[in-house]
Design a protein with these regions (language model features):
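Extracytoplasmic "Venus flytrap"
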Residues: 1-24, 28, 37-53, 57, ...
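Flexible loop/hinge segments that line or gate small-molecule binding clefts
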Residues: 68-106, 128, 225-234, 238, ...
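Short, solvent-exposed amphipathic alpha-helices that sit
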Residues: 17-34, 107-114, 139-159, 174, ...
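Hydrophobic alpha-helical
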Residues: 48, 52, 61-80, 84, ...
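Loop/turn elements at helix/coil->beta-strand transitions in domains of secreted/extracellular proteins
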Residues: 4, 33-34, 57-62, 80-84, ...
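Immediate post-signal peptide segment of exported/extracytoplasmic ligand-binding proteins
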Residues: 1-6, 30, 119-126
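Hinge/cleft segment of the Venus flytrap/periplasmic-binding protein
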Residues: 2, 132, 139, 151, ...
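Hydrophobic alpha-helical segments within soluble ligand-binding/sensing domains
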Residues: 99-127, 142-143, 172-176, 224-229, ...
C-alpha cells in the first residue's frame, strides 16, 4: 500500500453524521497504513471543485457522497480511471467500485413501524399523519416513501399528508417555522403523528409542537443528531428515531477504498438503522459517546 493515496470528499460537516464518517475513515486509514486526504466541501459547486482536485492530483481512489445531482462528478472520476466509493445514499447510474450506506427506504419503514406501535396503543386515533419531506434530495424522498407506504398498508383509512418542503425549510429552524404555520390551521385532534425525513425536519417539528403544547402529536424521525437524542431523553414529543451508523460507514468506506486500490470492487455494503426510543436512548448515547471519544483526534 506504500505510495497509494485515497481522497475523501466530505460533504455536510455541519452534521455529526458526516463528521464521524470522516473521522472513522481517517482512523481506519491510519491503522491500515494508507494515506487518506480529506477535502471538505461546503456546497455542490465546492464539491465539484474538490472532485476536480482529486482528478488533477490523480488519487488512487475517491470516497464521495452518493447523490444523483453529482453524476457528472462521478463521470469525471471514472474518465480519469479513479475508482469511486460512495457513502450515505446508494445512487444508480454509474459503475461504482462500492456503495456504502443505509437503505433509506427501509429507514423510513423502520420509523413507520414505531409510529404504528404508537397508533396501535391509542384508544382512538384522531387526525392525520403528516410526513415532512424535502423532494430535492433522493435520500429524503426514499425515506418518505418508505414511511408513507408502511403507514398506508397498516392503516389504509388514515390520511397521510405529505408536506413537500424546500431545502431552506428542511433545516431545524426552517422546519420549526413551517410546522408552526402548519399547526395554526390544524387544531387539536387534526394531527396524530408527524414524521421528519431528516434530522432538521424532525427537530424543527418537535420544537414547534413543544412550544405550541401539542402533546397529542407524536414525532418520529431519522438520524441521531445530538438534538434528536435530547428530545428522546425528554420523551414527551419525540417518540423514536432511526439512527444511522456513521462510524461503521466510515470504516466500510475505507475498507472498500483499500480494496479498490488493489483492483477489487466490493459492490454494495448495506448497514441497518438502529431504532432508538426514550427507553433505549441512554444506552445508545453511552455507546455512541464511547465511539465518538475514540475518534476525537481524527475529526475533520
Amino acid at each position: 500500500m506504500s505510495g497509494k493515496k485515497v481522497a475523501l470528499v466530505l460533504f455536510g460537516t455541519n452534521f455529526d453524521y458526516f463528521v464521524y464518517i470522516g473521522a472513522s475513515a481517517k482512523k481506519t486509514a491510519e491503522e491500515a497504513g494508507i494515506q487518506l486526504d480529506v477535502l471538505n466541501a461546503s456546497d455542490f459547486v465546492d464539491l465539484s471543485e474538490k472532485v476536480s482536485q482529486v482528478v488533477t492530483i490523480k488519487y488512487d481512489a475517491c470516497i464521495v457522497i452518493g447523490l444523483p445531482a453529482i453524476m457528472a462528478d462521478y463521470q469525471a472520476l471514472g474518465e480519469a480511471g479513479i475508482p469511486v466509493i460512495t457513502y450515505d445514499s446508494m445512487v444508480d447510474g454509474f459503475d461504482f467500485s462500492a456503495r456504502v450506506g443505509s437503505d433509506n427506504y427501509v429507514l423510513g419503514t423502520q420509523a413507520a413501524e414505531e409510529a404504528i406501535k404508537y397508533l396501535e396503543s391509542l384508544d382512538e386515533i384522531n387526525g392525520e399523519v403528516i410526513c415532512l419531506n424535502c423532494p430535492e434530495g433522493e435520500t429524503m424522498n426514499s425515506r418518505a416513501r418508505g414511511f408513507m407506504d408502511t403507514i398506508a398498508a397498516r392503516f389504509p383509512e388514515l390520511t397521510v399528508n405529505e408536506q413537500k418542503l424546500g431545502a431552506t425549510d428542511s433545516t431545524a429552524e426552517g422546519a420549526q417555522t413551517y410546522v408552526d404555520n402548519l399547526l395554526v390551521g390544524k387544531p387539536k385532534g387534526a394531527v396524530c403523528v408527524i414524521f421528519g425525513a431528516n434530522a432538521g425536519m424532525a427537530m424543527g417539528a418537535t420544537a414547534a409542537c413543544s412550544i405550541a403544547g401539542r402533546d397529542e402529536i407524536a414525532l418520529f424521525g431519522i438520524d441521531n443528531e445530538a438534538g434528536q437524542l435530547q428530545d428522546l431523553e425528554n420523551g414527551t414529543y419525540y417518540k423514536a428515531t432511526v439512527a444511522q451508523q456513521p462510524v461503521k460507514i466510515g470504516q466500510e468506506c475505507m475498507r472498500a477504498a483499500i480494496a479498490a486500490v488493489q483492483g477489487e470492487s466490493l459492490g454494495d455494503i448495506g448497514l441497518p438503522g438502529i431504532v432508538v426510543t426514550p427507553e433505549t436512548v441512554a444506552d445508545f448515547i453511552a455507546q455512541q459517546d464511547k465511539e465518538y471519544e475514540a475518534l476525537a483526534p481524527y475529526k475533520p
